[in-house]
Regions:
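Accessory nucleic acid-recognition modules appended to NTPase machines
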Residues: 1-139
Length: 141
């Protein structure tokens, strides 16, 4: 959970998470185990990865399609890293990542109420958008 917290808001692969665990945590773990843990965390609604948005299936622009990793609630990532308010105030980059997670969480709640979805966008040139909200609003009389 600590490694996932360090990579939330990114498109980190299982290999990246595995390397982070090997570097920063004790013990060795296989990629199958990491995958199983992530699946279990998804099933109990602790994490919810955000899919990539592709504006045009026939576009010549290479769009990155990896999911962005997020905790359902940013406080879970903060707790996993053992951080407190002073830690976040003194590390504004980390604070910004958790703030982004909070914004994504709220956008997902609002979009879901409108039968919508939230995606991210990033192309090969580095152009990115943290949140693309798609909602279909149909009013029937």
């Amino acid at each position: 959970m600590r490694s996932y917290a360090r990579h939330q808001g990114s498109q980190a692969s299982i290999a990246t998470i595995l390397a982070d665990i090997s570097t920063n945590d004790t013990g060795n773990i296989s990629d199958e185990t990491v995958g199983a843990y992530l699946t279990a965390l998804r099933k109990i609604f602790v994490i919810e990865d955000m899919p990539a948005w592709n504006p045009n299936l026939r576009s010549k622009t290479a769009v990155r399609t990896s999911d962005t990793r997020y905790y359902v609630d940013p406080s879970l990532g903060v707790a996993a890293l053992g951080l407190g308010p002073n830690d976040l105030v003194n590390d504004l980059n980390t604070f910004g990542l958790f703030f982004e997670t909070m914004c994504i969480r709220d956008l997902r709640v609002y979009a879901d109420a409108l039968d919508g979805s939230v995606y991210h966008y990033r192309d090969k040139n580095g152009l990115e958008c943290d949140a693309v909200v798609l909602c279909v609003m149909v009013h029937m009389v």
